[in-house]
Amino acid sequence: FPYQGSSTILESGNVNDYEVVYPRKVTALPKGAVQQKYEDAMQYEFKVNGEPVVLHLEKNKGLFSKDYSEIHYSPDGRRITTHPLVEDHCYYRGHIRNDADSTASISACNGLKGHFKLRGETYLIEPMKISNSEAHAVYKYENVEKEDEAHKMCGVTQNWESYEPIKKASQLIVSTEFQRYMEIVIVVDHSMYTKYKGDSDKIKAWVYEMINTISESYRYLYIDIIVSALEMWSEKDLINVETSAENTLKSFGEWRAKDLIHRISHDNAQLLTATDFDGPTIGLAYVASMCDPKRSVGVVQDHSSVNHLVAITLAHEIAHNLGVHHDKSSCSCGSGYTCIMSPVINSEVIKYFSDCSYIQCREYISKENPPCILNKPLRTDTVSTPVSGNELLEAGKDYD
């Protein structure tokens, strides 16, 4: 090991066993290439367990919609909408070279932060809080001291035990016509805004990292997740956020249909809150409700200092909107892995949807064909010019 640490406080909490690494960028820009702040592709070398690895990263170009907006409120209650330039963002996905099964979801905004899978093991990486140092900590999630060993659960309680998929995953034909595009609005309520001390940059980084993580998981379901807007209830809540997840979900859905849907083009909205929901519940969503003005919503508690765990809860609730139910014990996403649609969130890094989730999502889409997720939105890196005919559907799209 270059250096082995016994215990340190990182953003994810107190980590008992970690390795200090110094990632070295090895990308060579092509001759004459324009230097972006964050290149489209980057490679970093560092050591894990004393062994050199090469992390290959590619920018997640479809992360933001072309008309992405951020909304907050002034002290006198006025809504302030901005359209920040997000083309040159710092969110990447990738893999470890020479490991076919590896994946990575990384933000490169200030050092490397995120997670990667190497030889079947998931590692977290983040910069260490040492001034003028390139030092990063690499560790397994199991080495993070758990704040709370109590079970955390999704609040969807319908009993789907009788649900049997019509087809096996291997019988489903997959083609490009299965690809869907979900434009999502994330709403951060006032309790969460206060939790992060009103630091909107910190909140944005937290949310973007989550979306980058879940977009990787949703690729397996042939669904692109695109952020249309981030709204922060900076002055006060615009609905009554209660400890009852059911009441909060109902209020949020009604608010979306009455307000949000009329000013932002999107297909689905999720509320992030620091409110501690009753009992073990950390999230709730309507099932099979995509594109419905009141019901294409979910509520998620910001329940962990580990970004990945909140991200997976978000992925879980969105999947309910897509007609996906909780996994039964016969569902699998690979040997030894807990899958995203497990009704209980346990203390491990989860990345994958199960075979059951895949089948249920495909069946819901082929049976219901929710119309709002059919169109491919313009990406931030697309330069649009007026065209004749229907080539640019975006301009006249009728949402929901």
Curated annotation (Swiss-Prot):
Binding residue positions for Ca(2+) 1: 183, 267, 372, 375
Gene Ontology molecular-function annotations: metal ion binding; metalloendopeptidase activity; toxin activity
Subcellular location, record wording: Secreted
GO cellular component: extracellular region; plasma membrane
Cofactor, how bound (note): Binds 1 zinc ion per subunit.
SUPFAM superfamilies: Metalloproteases ('zincins'), catalytic domain
Domain Peptidase M12B: 180-377
Tissues where this protein is expressed: Expressed by the venom gland.
PANTHER family: ADAM A DISINTEGRIN AND METALLOPROTEASE DOMAIN, DISINTEGRIN AND METALLOPROTEINASE DOMAIN-CONTAINING PROTEIN 28
Family under the similarity heading: Belongs to the venom metalloproteinase (M12B) family. P-I subfamily.
Protein role: Snake venom metalloproteinase that impairs hemostasis in the envenomed animal.
Protein name as annotated: Snake venom metalloproteinase H2
